[in-house]
UniProtKB/Swiss-Prot annotation:
GO cellular component, one term: viral outer capsid
Similarity comment: Belongs to the rotavirus VP4 family.
Keyword field contains Zinc-finger: no
Taxonomic lineage of the native organism: Viruses, Riboviria, Orthornavirae, Duplornaviricota, Resentoviricetes
InterPro entries hit by this protein: Rota_A_VP4 (IPR042546), Rota_VP4_MID (IPR035330), Rota_VP4_MID_sf (IPR038017), VP4_helical (IPR035329)
Biological processes, Gene Ontology terms: permeabilization of host organelle membrane involved in viral entry into host cell; virion attachment to host cell
Site feature (Cleavage) residues: K231, A232, K247, I248
Pfam families xrefs: Rota_VP4_MID, VP4_helical
Protein's name in the database: Outer capsid protein VP4
Entry coiled-coil feature ranges: 495-515
Keywords: Capsid protein, Coiled coil, Hemagglutinin, Host cell membrane, Host endoplasmic reticulum, Host membrane, Host-virus interaction, Membrane, Outer capsid protein, Viral attachment to host cell, Viral penetration into host cytoplasm, Viral penetration via permeabilization of host membrane, Virion, Virus entry into host cell
Length: 736
């Protein structure tokens, strides 16, 4: 099948970064870091702790601790080779950790069972539950590890040790023959430089030659004493900061207008205002195509946010645009089709800059044309909330991406200008720099499950809003006579020029679409149509590929085609929705489809229009995606029966006889979810006419039903009037 230009745009091969290609061509630097993962490769532990606290320093610089391991069996023979530590992240609730022994209690066989008991709970052994013995239940007054065991003459005993660390466990040592020592110790604090793992120990034989150790939760293993690593893991970085206090006495209102100088035509006015800034950060998660495990990107959007506040008794309507610069890029995932992966996700990290472009409806922005002595005193932001996003993969638990806090410090203020679809507005740009963050991490499921990746910085936000206050002052040159108005005070319409260009081009485009040769259109539709083809067709546009791609993508994201193509479960939709959604389903590899015809018309026509700007090209791409060939039909084939859906009706027919049959709506829905969906380029009426007029065979009918491109092209080349008439009918629908 031809590589549809629209399909490339839907699958996000081209995307915009930063501030969606700013009009002022500001720097949008992206820093890509290659990080030495160290022992996270083995331990997969986050260097952070959830919450608004310091960033924890990692000490896993050697591969001593490995895991987390998910296998449910540790063979007894592996315990006899050398000393080994079994380590656990402290569970959230009371849970069984491991057991060695038969399936049910047997007084003739030694056994032991390890539990984690959360403070304030009672723990009752599963293995020894059938015994009438008080030792089978232990009350945990603090977080504890509890070992239940029987061996030799001991019918049942238990050992409890404190588990105050975030991560800890026990030592298992080989002794004589086929026996091991289970060693336990109270894990209270990290005050000493060494740790005695053998405060208590007991020697155990193997229960039976066929019995190993059953593991009930994820665990880590260490072949050398892990105390140093566990100690360092819990010690946060310490930042020394200086605090100062001062008393400020204000003798007048901060919100004032002061005339600095004045003559007959002009006056200089100093404006001083209190100001409230709000920061809203929001991520955009873009899902790729394929099996449903592939996510293209997780990026921070440029956010437009409005809010109100009171300034000196006046209600102020404020508008801000929040964007970022100098972000880090990360990726995650495997290579197989069913491996969950993220192609790229942005991370706000140290030295990332946040830009807040601010304007409000007060008089100061109407008079902000010629300005000097601009200064601002703005507080910083600590943007904090516990935010998570869970990726909806088809099978298994949904992996989660988690972030919590990031601190922004104010650096400087500049004059700026914002362009919207309606007006151009003067504004102020407040620049903030990131100085610290709580870090991010990913989990295999909910937030309490295994960590699969982590790092410093801030990786996801759900639209939470934070606030800071400050004041601004500047001197503006304005007319002495208030009846004079500057152009910016009455605003200027930006979009009017684009609409005029589109109107001028519409008639030319539609005439050209009529005049393009039918064979040329179909030949182009069956060739690989890429974004490069589109750029080659409009050489008059003097912009970089990146700028053009970003602007086209920005416009295309608002089309109905783009929004409909993300739906995956077609069985949940009515027929009308299905017709707009099936374009994202795999088709026959040799088949022609409607999207390839529409993009071929567009590419073959735009090279004759002498386009000179990116906005006009983007508008044509978006309008052609939504408006070309509005009357589309789709079909599925199974066991010689064709199921067809058009905008007005649904029907089915026998492929051999072309006799209509009863339409099975349930089967149609199942096929639409699982089977290749074919664009009905040659409709049913044309198929019947071909059979009755030319007596074509079943094999040719099948190829026409399947929209086989070589077959359709051969009929076009031979000037078949029925096929030509059908294709021309489709092309006549291609109107801007």
């Amino acid at each position: 099948m031809a590589s549809s230009l629209y399909q490339q745009l839907i699958s996000q091969n081209y995307y915009s970064i930063g501030n969606e290609i700013l009009t002022d061509q500001q720097t949008t630097e992206t820093v890509v870091d290659y990080v030495d993962a160290g022992n996270y490769t083995y331990a997969q532990l986050p260097p952070t702790k959830w919450g608004a606290r310091g960033t924890f320093k990692s000490a896993f610089n050697v591969s001593n601790i490995t895991g987390p391991h998910t296998n449910t069996i540790i063979e007894w023979s592996n315990l006899l080779n050398s000393n080994g530590w079994v380590i656990y992240q402290k569970p959230a609730n009371t849970t069984k950790l491991f057991k060695h022994g038969p399936e049910t209690y047997n007084s003739n066989l030694a056994a032991f069972e390890l539990w984690y008991g959360k403070a304030g709970t009672s723990v009752t052994s599963d293995y020894y539950s059938s015994l009438q013995n008080n030792e089978k239940t232990v009350t945990a007054t603090s977080d504890s590890l509890i070992l239940f065991w029987n061996e030799g003459s001991t019918v049942l005993a238990n050992k409890k040790v404190n588990f105050s660390w975030d991560m800890g466990g026990m030592l298992i040592k080989p002794t004589r023959g086929n026996r091991v020592d289970i060693c336990m110790a109270n894990m209270n604090d990290f005050n000493s430089s060494i740790f005695n793992w053998e405060e208590w120990k007991h020697e155990f034989p193997r229960s039976d030659v066929n019995i190993n150790v059953n593991m009930y939760t994820d665990y880590y293993l260490a072949s050398e004493d892990p105390y140093t690593e566990l100690k360092a893991l819990q010690q946060p970085n310490i930042t020394t900061f200086e605090m100062k206090m001062m008393k400020i006495i204000r003798n007048g209102s901060i919100n004032l207008n002061e005339v600095v100088s004045k003559d007959s035509l002009w006056q200089e006015v100093r404006y001083a205002r209190d100001i409230t800034l709000e920061c809203k950060i929001e991520s955009e998660v873009v899902k790729g195509g394929g099996w449903g495990y592939d996510y293209t990107s997780v990026a921070f959007k440029t956010v437009n946010h409005t809010y109100t506040y009171t300034r000196a008794g006046e209600i102020v309507n404020a508008h801000v645009t929040i964007s970022f610069n100098n972000m880090k890029e990360r990726s995650y995932g495997g290579s197989l089709p069913t491996d969950f992966k993220i192609g790229r996700f942005d991370v706000i990290d140290t030295d990332t800059y946040m830009y807040i472009d601010y304007w409000d409806d007060s008089e100061i922005f109407k008079n902000m044309v010629y300005v000097r002595d601009l200064s601002a005193n703005i507080g910083g932001f600590f943007y904090y909330a516990e935010m998570s996003y869970y990726f909806q993969i088809p099978v298994g638990a949904h992996p989660g991406l988690h972030s919590s806090g990031v601190r922004f410090v104010y650096e400087r203020c500049l004059l700026s200008q914002q362009f919207t679809d309606q007006v151009a507005l003067n504004s102020m740009r407040f620049i903030f720099r990131v100085t610290e963050s709580n870090g991010w991490f990913m989990t295999s499921g909910n937030i309490n499950t295994r960590r699969i990746a982590s790092g410093t910085g801030f990786a996801y936000a759900d639209g939470h809003t934070s606030q800071t206050v400050g004041n601004i002052t500047f001197i503006s040159l304005i007319p002495s006579n208030p009846n004079y108005q500057t152009p910016i005070a009455s605003s200027s319409t930006v979009r009017m020029d684009l609409e005029r260009k589109i109107n001028d081009l519409r008639n030319d485009f539609n005439q050209l679409a009529n005049s393009v040769a039918l064979g040329d259109i179909l030949s182009l539709a069956t060739s690989p149509l890429t974004f490069a083809n589109l750029l080659e067709s409009v050489p008059a546009i003097a912009s970089s590929v990146k700028d053009v791609a970003a602007n086209v993508m920005k416009k295309f994201r608002n089309t109905k085609m783009f929004k409909k193509a993300t739906k995956a479960k077609y069985s949940e939709f009515i027929i009308g929705d299905l017709l707009e959604d099936v374009t994202n389903v795999a088709r026959n590899s040799n088949g022609m489809n409607f999207d390839d015809i529409t993009s071929a018309v567009m590419v073959s026509t735009t090279n004759k229009l002498q386009l000179t700007d990116v906005d006009t090209l983007s508008e044509i791409v978006a309008r052609s995606a939504d408006n070309f060939i509005p009357n589309r039909s789709y079909r599925m084939i199974e066991d010689g029966i064709v199921y067809e859906a058009t905008p007005k009706r649904t029907f089915s027919y026998d492929l051999t006889t072309l006799q209509q049959r009863e339409f099975d709506i349930d089967k149609f829905m199942r096929l639409a979810s699982k089977s290749p969906v074919i664009s009905a380029i040659v409709d049913f009426a044309t198929l019947k006419a071909m059979r009755e007029t030319y007596g074509v065979g079943t094999d040719v009918i099948y190829k026409l039903v399947a929209s086989d491109a070589p077959t359709i092209l051969s009929f076009i080349d031979n000037n078949n009037p029925l096929i030509k008439s059908r294709i021309e009918e489709l092309l006549r629908q291609c109107r801007l």
